[in-house]
Amino acid sequence: MSEMDKVQEKPSQTTKTEVQAKLPKVGVLLVNLGTPDGTSYGPMRRYLAEFLSDRRVIEWPRLIWYPILYGIVLNTRPKRSGKLYDRIWNREKNESPLRTYTRAQGEKLATALADYPNVVVDWAMRYGQPSIESVTDRLLQQGCERIVMFPLYPQYSATTTATVNDKFFEALMKKRFQPAVRIVPSYETEPVYIEALARSIEKHLETLSFKPEVVLASYHGIPKSYSDKGDPYRQQCLETSRLLQARLGLDDSQFRSTFQSRFGPEEWLQPYTDETVEELAKHGVKSMAVLNPGFVADCLETVDEIGNEAAEEFLENGGESFSHIPCLNDSEDGMKVIETLVRRELQGWV
């Protein structure tokens, strides 16, 4: 090889090294609803104030809503909600199950994506800590030039997915440098999600000493007026249920869909979970199992509202056997859903 050939070869090697060194870091941000830091009055009030002040959650005019919120709700509800949270509190970690599971989901996803050396995984809450803004800052400080943000809601609603998007972009609005962004969309019909739900139901039913006459899919409700204005949430929930029912091979008498957690005087999406549970028991149904397809992790609304309150209502009205089917949480099937959707959005960036 001549000296001229060596000189010509060297720049191409340098260029390749430089290109490899400049592979941008990509952040993956998992976001769930949120949780109070404790069950006492102070932490509960701070959490509820942030949550119930969100215009996406309560659409009433502020002149009407704020006097109710600050004059009544925040003086009475923190104590009552604190007692409910205390029933499900993770004593070992001194936190709610939602925070425990969301952290575990983040850690397991990071391990699963270890084959991508330029990917950084973190997690945040829309309300409470760690906040979306603080974790976004952390990702940027670590050199992330691109971020995949994943609102952990299978079905889209302005009250959940949209407000997470709002807060994320609000954080970016303050930045001089803004990373490229991808948002993981709702996944109410994704085969990997439907299969994970079906497998979780089948595995749970195998552990029971009874065969439920009814499997009830209970989704968090929203005011009917929101749906009437175009929120696609109800349709997406029912589509999830349709696919899940078909996968399980259950008929309409064996599988029902309902909506829970209504708040305030407005009409919410129906049928209501509590009324349906009571009605089924009074009409002779002796055994049932309830799952929450719209929640990726167990929380107050699943563990207590269904596992305790709905169970009591069913048994008090003539039912004999009741079981709550846990959410996917950080199970193998649940993590497969999250990993599959994140890997799809990472294409072209890793």
From Swiss-Prot:
Q: Which SUPFAM superfamilies match?
A: Chelatase
List, alphabetically, the InterPro entries matched: Ferrochelatase, Ferrochelatase_AS, Ferrochelatase_C, Ferrochelatase_N
Which GO CC annotations does the UniProt entry carry? cytoplasm
**Organism phylogeny:** Bacteria, Pseudomonadati, Pseudomonadota, Alphaproteobacteria, Hyphomicrobiales
The UniProt record lists the EC number as 4.98.1.1
* Alphabetic keyword roster: Cytoplasm, Heme biosynthesis, Iron, Lyase, Metal-binding, Porphyrin biosynthesis
Pathway(s) annotated for this protein in UniProt: Porphyrin-containing compound metabolism; protoheme biosynthesis; protoheme from protoporphyrin-IX: step 1/1
Q: What family name appears in the similarity comment?
A: Belongs to the ferrochelatase family.
Its recorded reaction(s) are: heme b + 2 H(+) = protoporphyrin IX + Fe(2+)
Q: Which organism is it from?
A: Brucella anthropi (strain ATCC 49188 / DSM 6882 / CCUG 24695 / JCM 21032 / LMG 3331 / NBRC 15819 / NCTC 12168 / Alc 37)
Top-level EC class, please? lyase
Q: What is its subcellular localisation?
A: Cytoplasm
- Molecular functions (GO terms): ferrochelatase activity; metal ion binding
**Presence of the UniProt keyword Ligase in the record:** no
Q: Would you tell me the protein name for this molecule?
A: Ferrochelatase
Amino acids binding Fe cation: H220, E301
Keyword Heme tagged: no
Biological role stated in the UniProt entry: Catalyzes the ferrous insertion into protoporphyrin IX.
- Single biological process term from Gene Ontology: heme biosynthetic process
